[in-house]
C-alpha cells in the first residue's frame, strides 16, 4: 500500500487536483465555509471526481498538525518526482538549470525555493538527504503547488553528486559573501547549477571546494546577507534574464 501524506491549504490541494487527482484519497473542508473561494474549490473537486467531507474546524486542525490549512485538507498518496540525476539531464532540451541547496532544513525556506524554482524553469532541486527537510505539509503549502511540478532529489553524498554533474558538463556556481566575482559575471546561458548554503552557515567546506566558481550577490545596503529563498530567486532570475536576453 502506498504511503500517504497530508496536503493543507487551497494552493497545495488544488495543485494536486490539477496534476494528479487520482492520488487524492479524501478531501476534508470546513463545514461552516460557504464563500466563493470554497465554492470554486468544491466544483474543482467534483469535476475531478474526488469525495469531499465537510467537517468541523477542529478536525481540520488535527489533520493539518499545525500547518495553516485555510479550511481545506486532503489525504493523498505520496507522489515522488525524484529520479536520478542522469534521468533528469537526459530529457532536458537545451542548457540545464538546477538548484542545489546545502543544509536548508526550514520547510518555509524549502517551499519558497521550490516555488521560485518552478517559476524560473528549474529542471530539478537537489539537496543532501541528511541535511534537508522532506516534502511535508508546510513545504507543500508554501510551495503553492511547485512540490508537484519540480523534481526534488535528495542524495546521500552531495559532493559526489556535484562531481557527477561536472562530468555531465554542468557548471557549478556557489554563492559566497566573500567571493571576488559578482553573480552578474556568471555565464548563466550554459548548463549550470546555482549552489546555495543555509542562512547563517553557508555552504559546507567540501561543497564550496567542489564548485567551479564562487560569486557574491551585490549588497548595497546595511544588511550583510539575504534569506536563502530570496538569494535563490535573485540568482535564478539572473539565469532567466541571460537566457531570454
From Swiss-Prot:
InterPro entries hit by this protein: 23S_rRNA_MeTrfase_RlmB (IPR024915), Alpha/beta_knot_MTases (IPR029028), Ribosomal_eL30-like_sf (IPR029064), rRNA_MeTrfase_TrmH (IPR004441), SpoU_MeTrfase (IPR001537), SpoU_subst-bd (IPR013123), tRNA_m1G_MTases_N (IPR029026)
Entry binding sites for S-adenosyl-L-methionine: 197, 217, 226
Gene3D superfamilies named among the record's database cross-references: 3.30.1330.30, 3.40.1280.10
Record-annotated disulphide pairs: none
GO MF, any single term: rRNA (guanosine-2'-O-)-methyltransferase activity
Cell compartments where the protein resides: Cytoplasm
Primary location: cytoplasm
Keyword vocabulary terms for this entry: Cytoplasm, Methyltransferase, rRNA processing, S-adenosyl-L-methionine, Transferase
Classification via SMART domains: SpoU_sub_bind
UniProt entry tagged with the keyword Cytoplasm: yes
Source species, domain of life: Bacteria
Assigned EC number: 2.1.1.185
Function as written in the Swiss-Prot or TrEMBL entry: Specifically methylates the ribose of guanosine 2251 in 23S rRNA.
Protein name: 23S rRNA (guanosine-2'-O-)-methyltransferase RlmB
Organism listed in the record: Bordetella pertussis (strain Tohama I / ATCC BAA-589 / NCTC 13251)
